[in-house]
Amino acid sequence: MAVKKFNPITPSRRQMTMPTFEEITSQQPEKSLLVSLKSKAGRNAQGKITVRHRGGGVKRKYRIIDFKRNKDSIPAKVATIEYDPNRSAYIALVVYTDGEKRYIIAPAGLKVGDVIVSGPDSDIKPGNALPLKNIPVGTVIHNIELQKGKGGQLVRSAGNSAQLMAKEGNYATLRLPSGEMRYVRIECRATIGTVSNPTNDIVNIGKAGRKRHMGWRPTVRGSVMNPNDHPHGGGEGKSPVGRPSPVTPWGKPALGYKTRKNKKYSDRFIIKGRNAK
């Protein structure tokens, strides 16, 4: 998929780029797979801000995605490739031979008219989903389960893929996009191929207004706040931080500070961390 540039008729247009959406085949989503999505604006159930800089944005509906891919041995034909405002990857509407319709994460190269299928006896081709024990070593995969039957949780964003490196006993070794090597149970499912929209990471937003349409609000630097609002605030003019290192609004180190729990249950499954040399 290509990226479109614009003539520099305004300062923001000079830098802006946008996907060409040449893979998209339908503008109208399947109504039976839509649900209302209330804007949370970064608030939790108590109304407190848990994610800063969120709010506003264009109204959107949530598309119900089939991450489990548990409709085995029934072929499904790809009806449309669609844009999903809730994720970076494109989605595909598939129609099973029994008439049921579902959305799936569209892998790269999937086209309208292609036939996909789930189950342990499926062929190794993009879009098919099967347990890791039935996938050959070296295969590129995405939408990977961490628990059998729970649905894919890993490698779902645009252009990403993991690789099946080895299988031993009850576990398969995967290399994730971050560089992390980890064990996953071999009965967990994954989908063959790479996630669609690989050029998503080189798109330049170009202007603040386009970011506001996505539901992001401005970020204010701590150094221009008052001292009661941020540890970096206060002072006359441009003042230094006044601490050994920059900190968050709540006083914790902001750069290079490890926030992962050091006794997390999944540590036993991680062979090599994403930051390991």
UniProtKB/Swiss-Prot annotation:
The keyword Lyase does not apply. One of its GO terms (cellular component) is large ribosomal subunit. It comes from the Bacteria. GO terms for biological process: cytoplasmic translation. Keywords: Ribonucleoprotein, Ribosomal protein, RNA-binding, rRNA-binding. GO terms for molecular function: rRNA binding; structural constituent of ribosome; transferase activity. Gene3D superfamilies: 2.30.30.30, Nucleic acid-binding proteins, Ribosomal protein L2, domain 3. Residues 223-261 are annotated as: Disordered. One of the primary rRNA binding proteins. Required for association of the 30S and 50S subunits to form the 70S ribosome, for tRNA binding and peptide bond formation. It has been suggested to have peptidyltransferase activity; this is somewhat controversial. Makes several contacts with the 16S rRNA in the 70S ribosome. Belongs to the universal ribosomal protein uL2 family. This is Large ribosomal subunit protein uL2. It comes from Clostridium botulinum (strain Eklund 17B / Type B). The lineage of its organism: Bacteria, Bacillati, Bacillota, Clostridia, Eubacteriales.
